[in-house]
From Swiss-Prot:
It holds the Pfam family Ribosomal_L1. GO terms for biological process: regulation of translation; translation. The gene is rpl1. The keyword Transferase does not apply. This is Large ribosomal subunit protein uL1. It comes from Thermoplasma volcanium (strain ATCC 51530 / DSM 4299 / JCM 9571 / NBRC 15438 / GSS1).
């Protein structure tokens, strides 16, 4: 499949789905084949920076020192210090709300061990363990990059669902995002394109359109 096939599918999705009263996300479903997902080494677990962004904001949490917190102010959505780790360890319900609301977590490297010990039971199963950042490093570039990054995780399934943008985004930009994702995933598969059964594009509430055939599902 090439960029033209992808663009046709994206445009078909837009045409077939009525306008909603909210901004719909656009996502792809990548169906794999001939892969043993019971073997952990075959599972896909990728974070992919989209060339044209996600089209909407996602929330990023940072744990750090006063210096790191000051640098992250106005860019990160939740900013916490070392003292908040023990607070959340005692109030897991409050922490779970934040975890469910945020997409990525960052933590100063010196705090990682404490976070893993105190909050790992909440973060780990959700695939949201923090990315470590060295003390003193400016977190802003990483935060901005993560806000344009998506996760592609198969776990033990042969289907990956990955957000690629929003309906209001230009079709070409959405298509380029999809191409970037497919290139990354294909590069991780033992047999490349031969391990991909098919790819569908859909909006939040719309019908799925298969890339390359135009079939709806």
């Amino acid at each position: 499949m090439d960029i033209n096939d992808i663009s046709k599918a994206v445009e078909a999705v837009k045409q077939s789905s009525p306008q909603r009263k909210f901004e719909e996300s656009v996502e792809i479903a990548i169906n794999l084949k001939d892969i043993d997902m019971t073997n952990p080494k075959n599972r896909i677990n990728e974070e992919i920076l989209l060339p044209n962004g996600r089209g909407k904001d996602v929330k990023v949490v940072i744990f750090g020192s006063e210096e790191l917190k000051a640098k992250a102010k106005g860019v990160a959505d939740y900013i916490f210090g070392p003292e908040d780790i023990s607070k959340f360890a005692e109030d897991k319900k409050a922490f779970k709300k934040i975890v469910n609301d945020a997409y990525f977590f960052i933590a100063e490297a010196t705090l990682m061990a404490n976070i893993g010990k105190s909050l790992g039971q909440v973060l780990g199963p959700r695939g949201k363990m923090p990315r470590p950042i060295p003390p003193g490093q400016d977190p802003v570039p990483l935060i901005k990059a993560l806000k344009n990054t998506v996760k592609a995780r198969s776990r033990n399934s042969l289907t990956l669902h990955v957000p690629v943008g929003t309906r209001s985004m230009d079709t070409q930009k959405i298509s380029e995002n999809i191409m970037a994702i497919l290139n990354r995933i294909t590069g991780k598969l033992e047999r490349g394109h031969s391990n991909i059964k098919n790819v569908y594009v859909k909006t939040t509430m719309g019908k799925a359109v298969q890339v390359g055939t135009g079939d709806q599902n």
